[in-house]
Amino acid sequence: MPPDREEAGRRPAAILIAGPTASGKSALAARLAERHGGVVINTDSMQVYADLRRLTARPDPDEEARVPHRLYGHVDGAVNYSAGHFSRDAAALLATLGGRLPVFVGGTGLYFRALEQGFSELPPVPDTVRARVRDAAEGRPTEALHADLARHDPEGAARLRPSDRMRVMRALEIFLATGRPIASFYGDPVPGPLAGRDLRRIFLAPDRAALRERIDARFRTMIAEGALDEVARLRARRLDPMLPVMRAHGVPGLIAHLDGALSLDEAIARGQADTRAYAKRQLTWFRHQMGEAWRWVDPEGATVEDLL
């Protein structure tokens, strides 16, 4: 339902638009920014990377030229970019907008949380420790790594799914680098740049069946428009396979295809399935984690006038 009359007559400090992948967030954000002289600000953890415009469905150059877009493709794939990096970049950007309306859009819940609730600063991990954990993980199931973590940091292990390889390895790195459990660094978060501000929070919740169809169709369109070539260039860089850019939806399967382990159709099917599963997790996470301050909107019936 539309906002009440008092709320609708008051311009917010920022608009936040979230939703599952392929729900139409980017197009809506561009329309809102164009209508109100705003700036679209990426809030998606994969669209920050310069290496994967097509595979992450970043706005194309024409779209970016029509209305200002920021924090898209500004990070090299070799960087392990985090919610903390994003929050600092967003704070610096907000200071330059000169009164223009910021429209944050994306699907990464932790980035939205960092904007309002802040983030905990984790210590740097030496490359030698990263290499030690990576070597220890080679050929071992994630559940075994989780058991290793439980011996060193039972509280940290209890917070993580035994199948969440990236976060389990990160917690192991922190413990080995500092001798402290990862939770000990969570007590004093850095404030978020939008904390206490007047915000419009919109979550796009499309029909599930229609969303699955859009995800599958979009993945094939990405391939037709050059996503496989993007992944080939990324593969040639020989980056650490645990980096976020190497784990983007579609990348592992397409690399397996380039290595001869999968047919292209098999790689596409894997990418589609991974993306559908991710969309389901996004819906679940926002429903349980972000509270009632967010308006859930069917994108099929949403208009710019309804949302501001």
UniProtKB/Swiss-Prot annotation:
Top-level enzyme category: transferase
CDD domains: NK
Catalytic activity: adenosine(37) in tRNA + dimethylallyl diphosphate = N(6)-dimethylallyladenosine(37) in tRNA + diphosphate
Amino acids binding ATP: 19-26
Keyword ATP-binding in record: yes
Documented EC number(s): 2.5.1.75
Domain of life of the native organism: Bacteria
Cofactor requirements of the protein: Mg(2+)
GO biological process: tRNA modification
GO MF term set: ATP binding; tRNA dimethylallyltransferase activity
Pfam annotation, one family: IPPT
Oligomeric form and interacting partners: Monomer.
Family membership: Belongs to the IPP transferase family.
Protein name, as recorded: tRNA dimethylallyltransferase
Gene: miaA
